[in-house]
Amino acid sequence: GYGQQLDKVLHVYGSAYVKQFYDRAFKLEGRFDESRLVYHTLRAYQEVEIGPYRIYPIPAQHGNFEEDCLIFAIQHQEENKALFYVHDSGIPNTRDLLFLSNKGMIFDLVSLDCTGQGQENSGAAHMSLQQNLILIEKMKTFNLVHDETRYIASHFSHNGGLTYEAMKAMSEVHGIVTSYDGMVIEY
């Protein structure tokens, strides 16, 4: 089985669409071990609490664009800190930003997809630095960020064509930190 070294149950969270892949993998492997791995299906806009975290799954602008992929607004309820995790997604639509605003979300940290790096437009399913800047301005319009919010550009690939140094130089002038493997952020 899977997770034999685990002394606790591993809880996995994702969309119904991802659950199909999860189930398929176990079926192909001929292994099911729900005593060690438990899948929880998340639905867009339905708040879920996991430990001290309040989480709002939001449809990503990715995949089939039918709520099959999710991005996450995560609030640590005890510390009253919030993270907007926007990877594998284009710019969230106005409806989604309004939803988060109506929930009173104000993000202390925003982790941005920047697959397109310095390209003018990375398409609808990912973002570039230029699209990151557009999203940041939209979040300001909806009062989803404050003056001390930290922005991290991440989720790069060779498709963007920039080295780490070039990406860092391009993003830091906009107050955006370029991530790297092993990076730890305290906020």
What are these regions (language model features)?
Residues 90-183:
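Cap/insert and terminal regions of metallo-dependent hydrolase folds
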Residues 12, 84, 109:
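Hydrophobic "anchor" residues on beta-strands that sit immediately upstream
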Residues 41-102, 182-187:
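Core dinuclear metal-dependent hydrolase active-site scaffold
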Residues 21-25, 167, 185:
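Hydrophobic packing residues within well-ordered alpha-helices of enzyme cores
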Residues 1-35, 40:
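Active-site HxH/HxHxD metal-binding segment of metal-dependent hydrolases
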Residues 29-34, 48-49, 169-170:
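Short, conserved catalytic or adaptor-binding loops enriched in Gly and charged residues
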Residues 36-40, 55-56, 171-178:
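Active-site regions of enzymes building and remodeling cell-envelope glycoconjugates
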Residues 1-7, 28-32, 76-79, 102-104, ...:
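Alpha-helix termini
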